[in-house]
Amino acid sequence: MSIIEIKHLTFAYPGAEKNTLNDVNLEIEKGDFVAIVGNNGCGKSTLCKTLNGLIPHFITGSYSGSVVADQVNVQDSEIGILARKVGYVYQDFENQIVRPTVLDDASYACMNYAMPDYLERGRKALAQCGLEGKEKEYIWQLSGGQTHLLALAGVVSLEPEILILDEPIAQLDPHHADLIYKILRNLNEKYGKTILVIEHHTEYIAEYCKHVVLMKDGHVEWKKRTKEALSRVEELQSCNIFPPQVTLAAYEMVKRNVIPKPELLPSSMEDGINLLGGLVCQQRGNDTGAGNFKHEKIVQFKNVSVSYRAVKGKAYKVFDGLGLDIHKGEKIALIGSNGAGKSTMMKLMTGLIKPLEGEILLKGRSVKDMRPEQLSREVSLVYQNPEDMFIKDSIEADIAFAMKERNQSDWEERAQSLLKRFRLLELKNRDGRLLSGGQMRRASLAIGIALNPEILLLDEPTANLDIATRKEIMKTLNDIKDITETVMIATHDMQLVCEWAERIIVLCQGQVIADGTRDEIFGDPEVVKRSGIRPPEIFTLGQEIQADAFCYTVDEFVKGFGGNGNEPDDEKNV
């Protein structure tokens, strides 16, 4: 029985020159768990917003076709009715948290509907979402993953049959990402909820989803069972979808005639080991670690301590005696679980947070009495949410803002140069908050380096991005050496870490527990376990097959385990 029926749906936003959705047809069965995939801008979020009535009742435009969700025609219904049929957790889920305490927030929607049992519904939803026992806590005491679960609980409290989540794990560490998906699986299997996720992380799709819907250029290309969908490597890559690394490794081995082609490519670790387990690694991946850096120290943390004070007066210590040196020219990845202190460390370097004890030196000078606006000439922070970088009504004005405020005579010429460099000339008059994810990232980077800082800090620069946009951001990071020599990123993206970083710093509960190269970090099981990080899937596959194999990318795995296989004519960098 279909719980969602979409027929010949076409939609264009007001003033848009072309349709965002084009003749979409889709049916989803009750109790299904579906991943919707496609490149940035293909219409995934727009399609989902037609299911809960946000389109066309709130966001108007050119709309034709029909959408039926849980036996209700969306166009003919009211949002108040649809909210109890279709629950939606948005990509910017923090905006769905509206009350100061956990139970108040979880039961708020039910209270708005004047349900007499609103508190009971809130408690039930919290239990279903793994937040039992957190009822009296303040929302700012929750971790990122718990906050996301609270947004989900607020939706679940209304007991909708359909749940939609837009990029549910984009900014979460592996532990919280697993927790989110385990909760979703329980809601699907135990409570019969039909779940749709918009997702770029195909390894989670492989583990949890039953079907995959591929969107391209505003229409649905196909809907297939997950294993079959993820085996269509070339088709997915053409839409900028990165299949699981296990799948890509097998695909490349088949292309090189190292193994015979299976009926379906593996998408899980178990299937990958079964198919590739007989191979032998003949060379290790080359570690790109910088080793002992000899360049000058540009930032020094000397016995730094930082605490936050909660509403009830209790102090929470983030750092206690932190000591660390950053050298000129380093490409550093800062990794660790949510709450480990990554963002706090970056804010200390920019002066947005001041240490309670110890000192921070920038090129030998204490930053204790320096204001953030003074430090911004030398240290620039690009925020996790790129929209937070936009304060004017156009990208051009945002890029020029800091330079104009500091009376730089060449601000106009430099703004044009940055627009050209970051391929933003055609977008220069657009409001940055209305751009696509990749365009926002490029624009925020241009703003971040406008003052030629010596140190560039980026918080989760590849979150919410498809493979093409992610590669574009990585290329940009490598291309700005002439402007900014020292770059530090805080990230949960271990593929980015292994492909880009020269030095990896691991934080755990406010302490640096490891600092070194890829081999030194991922080759130490104790560091991996204690920090909660998860090595790239391809690294784990290599280790399962051969304990001394250190392969951090699919390319390294193929070179190491490929033996005397033939190089394909259409070699692609995957």
Residue ranges with predicted function:
Residues V37-N39, I335-S337:
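The feature captures the beta-strand-to-loop junction immediately N-terminal to the Walker
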Residues N52, T350:
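Helix-to-loop junction immediately C-terminal to a conserved catalytic motif
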Residues T60-V72, G358-S366, L375:
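Conserved ABC transporter NBD signature motif
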Residues D117-K134, S409-L427:
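Conserved ABC ATPase "signature" region
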Residues Y138-L142, Q146, D431-L435:
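Conserved ABC ATPase signature
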Residues L163-D166, L456-D459:
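Catalytic Walker B motif of ABC-type/P-loop ATPase nucleotide-binding domains
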Residues D217-G218, G510:
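Conserved ABC ATPase "signature" C-loop
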